[in-house]
């Protein structure tokens, strides 16, 4: 297990990666390498301003080593998947979720998000880029939380560096190996029958007469008028 992840200076930077151990990144979160900025974010009451401030934080791709910040630029999977839990109505609910996550045998780490209103959880998975999304789908079912963010499944998903001196780490966490592949519903496309050109003049007239009669009716003697 490589346990090497990728850090970009911020979310705007996509092509200058730094590769560090996951331990290094979690140590930064615990010690507060971005403490001052995170505290500003948590004090900011305007959501738009918070989002702008977050763009200045280091951006971490926990799931591997990347040349650039996109899925196709992966060099090697780290053996980690980062999950988001957010949208809690109260701090009490968030604390209850955190307690539940720290007791889960598959959870490697849990820490508070930069906003202070959500949680990030790291889970160890096999180093299989092609199965990354399937592990994500299985973990969604496993945690069965209404606060689970379903949009964070792509392998190069960014996690902003946070600050949490009480970060939970369990280096003996178990490896998650179950996968769930989403069912694809085959949609039957009804196609019109191919049109066969009619070249016989009499046949054309016959078809037109039938159509006219059905639509408008015909008085005796009109056909040859």
Predicted regions: what they are:
Residues 1-79:
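DNA replication initiation on ssDNA origins
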Residues 2-13, 17-20, 28-33, 143-193:
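Catalytic "initiation/cleavage/transfer" segments centered on a nucleophilic residue
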Residues 5, 31-39, 43, 72-103, ...:
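Modules that initiate DNA replication and primer synthesis
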Residues 63-65, 114-116, 155:
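Short, glycine/charge-rich beta-strand/loop segments that flank catalytic centers
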């Amino acid at each position: 297990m490589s346990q090497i992840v990728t850090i970009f200076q911020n979310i705007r930077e996509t092509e200058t990666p730094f590769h560090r151990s996951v331990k290094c990144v979690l140590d930064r979160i615990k010690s507060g390498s971005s403490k001052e900025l995170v505290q500003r974010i948590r004090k900011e009451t305007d959501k738009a301003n918070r989002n702008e401030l977050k763009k200045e934080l280091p951006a971490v791709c926990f799931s591997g080593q990347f040349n650039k910040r996109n899925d196709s630029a992966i060099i090697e999977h780290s053996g980690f998947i980062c999950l988001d839990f957010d949208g809690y109505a109260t701090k009490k609910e968030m604390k209850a979720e955190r307690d539940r996550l720290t007791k889960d045998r598959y959870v490697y780490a849990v820490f508070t998000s930069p906003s202070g209103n959500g949680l990030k959880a790291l889970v160890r998975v096999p180093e299989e880029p092609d199965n990354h999304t399937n592990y994500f789908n299985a973990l969604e079912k496993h945690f069965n939380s209404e606060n689970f963010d379903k949009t964070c499944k792509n392998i190069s998903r960014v996690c902003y560096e946070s600050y949490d001196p009480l970060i939970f780490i369990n280096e003996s966490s178990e490896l998650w190996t179950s996968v769930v592949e989403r069912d694809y519903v085959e949609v039957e496309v009804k196609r019109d029958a191919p049109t066969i050109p009619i070249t016989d003049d009499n046949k054309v007239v016959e078809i037109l007469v039938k159509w006219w009669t059905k639509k408008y009716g015909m008085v005796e003697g009109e056909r040859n008028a």
